[in-house]
Amino acid sequence: MEHEVIRNLQSKLPFLSRGVAQVAYVVEDLEETVMSYHSLFGIGPWHFYTYGKPLLKTMKRYGKPAEYRMKVALSYFGDTRIEIIQHLEGDTVYADFIHKHGYGIQHLGFLVDNMDEALQRVEEAGLIVSMEGGGHGPDGDGYFAYLETEDLLGTTIELIERPKRRQPPEKIFPIQ
């Protein structure tokens, strides 16, 4: 039965076969984790952002308007983006994860070219979008959506439509 569900997802969500673009960790202390990852693994530079208002123009939880905030730091390890997230406030997938598991790897991110089309496919596949947000690019583009896949796949999947341009980070570590 479970293999049938996975095959169904492969056919309905072909963008998942492109490979994992991002691994994300939910942590208690963003700054401390970034410094540790830089010292231990040589990962950096890290770009810091606070997601929520005013950066995000759209925020939803289970399809309804929501408000939440989190600090994130982004970097790369090879071709894979590493995202470190510190939950700040609101009802989020991060708070759910912390409550259920504590801190650790919370989701895998997959790139999509067209979020509207991807979300239509998600609906057709029978998956639930638990949290989404967007408008964080300088041109009002960029969107993310979390799918309830933990029970099925052992982790949450995030769909990511990157903005064409990024806002300048609040800070960079280490300073270049």
Each model region followed by its residue ranges:
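Short, flexible, glycine/charge-rich loop motifs used to bind or transfer phosphoryl groups or to couple energy/partner
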Residues: 13-14, 95-99
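Extended intrinsically disordered, low-complexity coil regions enriched in Ser, Thr, Gly, Ala
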Residues: 31-52, 99-103, 111-137, 169-170
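Vicinal oxygen chelate
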Residues: 1-13, 20-28, 72-80, 97-114, 116-176
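Short, surface-exposed, polar/charged, turn-prone segments marking secondary-structure boundaries
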Residues: 53-54, 73-77, 103, 110-114, ...
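Conserved short beta-strand elements that form part of the metal-binding/catalytic scaffold
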Residues: 44-96, 141-164
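Long, hydrophobic N-terminal alpha-helical segment
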Residues: 5-60
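Short acidic/polar alpha-helix capping motifs at helix-coil junctions
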Residues: 1-2, 33-38, 82-86, 109, ...
